[in-house]
């Protein structure tokens, strides 16, 4: 499902969703269901975020973190021991481990958001005022020092490659070519805003940048 389609679903019914793979060194099996299907099922369904999270057959999927929400509630769940949990107002930075994990990239991103983006939003919440700063942060390729790398069951070189907010294009895996096969492909900012003159109505805006070098 494209970012534009996701924004359209929010405009229609106030629903949004994102899924991340859970990195623990366990290879996905061919008979497991697509994790991306969880996003489509929620966006096109009618269950509340919490009810949807509770009815997922967790064992049917490879490891994932799923964040789903509507205008009233947001919930995170994974199939690595994290039960469906409401997300209340605040700043959340989630990567490919447990939601509460403090990886270098999540704390680096959190710090830059607090210092460079949140002050801009406080001045003027219109997306055009602060989105450029946010995209600049999402493009940060600073890698973690060796002593701050998480241990997720992959090789050291891979762990370091994955440790930055923006993952630079690289030839990854068993490949005969030097052409990049892995890296950050899309950066998206979804903004949900309550309109003062429209009662309880919200508007959704999504802006994405695509990278086609791999």
Locations of regions flagged by a protein language model:
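N-terminal nucleophile
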Residues: 1-214
